[in-house]
Amino acid sequence: MALPIEGKLSMANNRIERLKSPSSSSTCSMDEVLITSSNNSSSICLETMRQLPREGVSGQINIIKETAASSSSHAALFIKQDLYEHIDPLPAYPPSYDLVNPNKEVRFPIFGDTAPCPKSSLPPLYAPAVYELTLISLKLERLSPYEISSNRSWRNFIIEINSTQLNFYHIDESLTKHIRNYSSGETKSEKEDRIHSDLVHRSDQSQHLHHRLFTLPTRSASEFKKADQERISYRVKRDRSRYLTDEALYKSFTLQNARFGIPTDYTKKSFVLRMSCESEQFLLRFSHIDDMIDWSMYLSIGISVSLDLEVREYPDYRIVPRRRRRRRRRRRRRRHTHRSESSMGSFSQRFIRSNSRPDLIQRYSTGSSTNNNTTIRERSNTFTAGLLDHYCTGLSKTPTEALISSAASGESSDNSTLGSTRSLSGCSASRSIASRSLKFKIKNFFRPKNSSRTEKLHRLRSNSSNLNSVIETEEDDEHHESSGGDHPEPGVPVNTTIKVERPMHRNRAISMPQRQSLRRAISEEVVPIKFPNSTVGESVHSPSPIEHLSVDGCEIMLQSQNAVMKEELRSVASNLVANERDEASIRPKPQSSSIYLSGLAPNGESATDLSQSSRSLCLTNRDAEINDDESATETDEDENDGETDEYAGDDTNDDTDDSNIGYAYGSESDYSCLIEERIRNRRRASSTLSCFSNIPYGTDDIKWKPAIKEISRRRYLRDSLKCIKPFLDSNDCLGKVIYIPVSGPTFETSNKIHFSNRQSLQKQKNHFLKGFIVGPTALIELNCKNKNAIVGTTKDAEDHGEDDGDGDDGEDDDDDDDDDDDDDDDEDDDDDDDDDDDDDDDDDDGQITA
């Protein structure tokens, strides 16, 4: 029977009182716990720990603690460490890998063999992330965010990118001695200072300013051609130790926090990138567009790997070309409208200079303030339609029919410029306008003159354009159409000189003596002309205006021009068909347009109806080609802007060439060939989904494995330029982090400077850098406190600015201002700015103090 708890507690108290005596000896059984006191060497058996209930044990422990505290000998307490040592006295070691891992196939990295590496073993060789060099022209814009460069002239250098470092070297004279009249853009004094920079350093600023005042201006830097650039770059890469020396080093920059982009606000030079490195900002001009695109990729790689991983930002590349709205139809109408307006303006100005009719100046002058845009647009559309109408009619008629038509019009064509301009073709009108431009004159100034067929045709067009200086009013045009001047009257003999009655009741703005003097001047300039394909064996002479009414000289000249153009276009079309259809052994002889049309016409149809049908056929073909061009998805994607047209090459006349080929009249096989070619072009330009309907049933080769469509060079250049971000000179750098070269600490572990015989730290490849934040008035030192806050704020501001300025947010607006960000540098002949200071202090560049 178990004793109650109160009895057990009383027994424990009795034992404690008995053990307090120093002479008593205590013995404990095996099931008792022995605790040693630190005050004396006697063993005190406090309590026999038997199997008691949980509440009994806790009560006994409390009693023991209170008794020990009240005792004078300060008995030892129950300590956990002693208990753990009593329970597990031996040290515990981790188990072996064999016991823990029963699967022998799984192997853990056990670094048991820590033998030192031999001294002969070398680390792997260093390979830069990117290394390339080329020839460029450099123009320094800013020495610091607060200081504009005084010397803004172009200078030629060798640029080298070595992973995260950008170096500029002077070009050795042996590399450019084959280039005639070469100039590096460096003054003679700068060259002497560079040569003697190892011995003499001009640290006095006053001496430098005095020297700059008496420096003669130098010539502008020569522009490298693509062949010269490739040849010199190859020689430098082959012998870098000779040309890329420390003495030839101009400046060295780090790519940490560097920026670059297309300077859309700079239009004087082509193939230019604006770059900001350390504290300076400069322009880089490349020799050709391929070099510019490649170096934009090299700079992006170097900037991305320049910073450490913990401070490196996520790259924000523009890997997809910027989206453009498809406005081909609208821009096509604008282009034709502007071209027509310019043509109308040139004709009206020539009329004002020659005839001085004040009643038509106010009516047809494009510069008049009374004419609004709607009237000009309607007038230009009428003018374009008249050109196409008369051009198609002139090609379809024989020379005799054209003579009859011009004679039937009579006096109505003498007083009209709009009616006479209808005899000009669209191709000849555009070429005559282009020939009068300044660029065309400069291009053909040094070209040797030859007596070829092209030169004769050009002189013929120029004579016709000089003669064609008469304007017809709208009332005269309506009266002329009502009188049927374009259609010959039946029964008129061909081989005789035609006399036409003057139409009555016509409002004439020029008196009869003036008209006769004008006609006499025109007839004197016209020479006897014989039509090339005329069936009549007589030549048309310019009769005297005294004997009888003569045929208008403008009509004769323009009809002969149409005949020559018809022969030229027919020969071009025949050559094209011969090249495309080599399998045809025998080709039918090209026939005349009138003979071919007469053969196609049914019985009972007149020649006038044939000309009408041919004219409608020509206009229909032109409309079909315009619709085909508008429906093409490849060419409709982007439009010609200033940047893309200049960099993409001279491929802007493809549509006009195709349309001119379509107007050439020849044999029946020519039409079938042109139709087949148009169908092939339309299928090739359409999308893959639209071509599924043309694939026969059961054919899986084309449907599931379509042919790879190679991208054209023009589209490659256009998309590459769109992927480069713009960089304006007014881009605010406030709050951005820049690095400035400073003198580093003198530690034994610091890398030694390779070439220390220079005062400027930017002229040393190995220099220390220190981060600063661009403040409103001065630079702020970058430390750990403001680094994260400023960098995070700057990044948010950049993201916000890009979201506001980008046009790709999904808004489908119709303004064309969003395309201006991608416009690159337009080609211009200006070499430099108007600044005359050509000297630059090489020793003071890069020394910026906060």
From Swiss-Prot:
Basic and acidic residues compositional bias, start-end: 479-489
Residue ranges of domain PH in the record: 194-306
Keyword Cytoplasm: yes
Any one GO CC term of the record: cytoplasm
Region named Disordered: 324-348, 406-428, 451-494, 583-659, 793-850
UniProt keywords, alphabetically: Cytoplasm
Lipid metabolism in keyword set: no
Location within or outside the cell: Cytoplasm
Main location: cytoplasm
Start-end of Low complexity biased regions: 406-416
Biased amino acid composition, Basic residues: 324-338
Biased composition (Polar residues): 417-428, 605-619
InterPro entries xrefs: PH-like_dom_sf (IPR011993)
Biased composition (Acidic residues): 626-658, 799-850
Miscellaneous comment: Present with 172 molecules/cell in log phase SD medium.
Record-given protein name: PH domain-containing protein YHR131C
Species: Saccharomyces cerevisiae (strain ATCC 204508 / S288c)
The organism's taxonomic lineage, starting at the top: Eukaryota, Fungi, Dikarya, Ascomycota, Saccharomycotina
